């Protein structure tokens, strides 16, 4: 339990404030570094009212940054390989009124639209999303939705290009011998599409503002 708590703490969203000088004016920008999309599934399923999640933590940090009179907000998804799909949906909901966030198509061709149904907007100010080639999966859902809604500017490199949904099966429970370790099996169960119909698979999200990288040299 202690180890899991420490791990969640290490992956949790963190805030900072940076100063940017432009046209003889110094702007104070709030930055939220988000290493992964996480949720305390055990806490939520057990009925804990204060369970941790990406959306809950970011909402709290945004309010703290607003109290510090920041001029804008940057969500840093660089290196964020994804995580809980539901958190990508609810996190987007902090910045839009309500509406579809992502389309999920299963192996039978059935399409399910994941929506934000909460009209509450936590932050209405200037918004930028930083991405790189390691921003994948849930990161691409969030960045793509922010871009499609015109809610903020996506800055950085084209993202990883992972537009599929995987499921993880623990094979140990099928072992004949309880001491036998068979590991886990991950397999693709669905593909997701942006609300504009585009797939991010092998394409990624192309930023509104492209920044040069070391790979470009």
Language model: regions and residue ranges:
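Acidic, S/T/G-rich, low-cysteine, solvent-exposed domains in lumenal/extracellular/periplasmic regions
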Residues: 168-170, 181-183, 205
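Conserved functional hotspot residues or short segments at active or partner-binding sites
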Residues: 195, 199-217
């Amino acid at each position: 339990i202690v180890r899991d708590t420490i791990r969640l703490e290490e992956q949790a969203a963190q805030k900072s404030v940076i100063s940017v000088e432009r046209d003889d004016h110094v702007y104070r920008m709030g930055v939220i570094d988000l290493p992964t999309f996480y949720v305390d599934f055990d806490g939520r399923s057990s009925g804990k009212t204060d369970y941790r999640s990406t959306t809950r933590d970011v909402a709290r940090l945004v309010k703290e940054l607003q109290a510090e009179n920041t001029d804008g907000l940057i969500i840093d998804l660089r290196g964020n390989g994804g995580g809980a799909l539901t958190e990508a949906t609810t996190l987007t909901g902090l910045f839009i009124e309500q509406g579809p966030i992502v389309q999920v198509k299963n192996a039978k061709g059935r399409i399910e639209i994941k929506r934000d149904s909460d009209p509450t907007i936590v932050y209405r100010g200037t918004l930028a999303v930083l991405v790189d080639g390691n921003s994948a999966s849930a990161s691409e859902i969030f960045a793509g939705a922010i871009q499609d809604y015109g809610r903020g500017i996506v800055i950085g490199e084209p993202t990883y290009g992972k537009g599929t949904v995987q499921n993880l099966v623990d094979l140990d429970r099928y072992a004949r011998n309880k001491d036998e370790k068979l590991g886990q099996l991950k397999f693709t169960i669905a593909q997701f599409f942006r609300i504009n119909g585009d797939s991010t698979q092998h394409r990624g999200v192309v930023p509104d503002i492209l920044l040069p990288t070391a790979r470009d040299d």
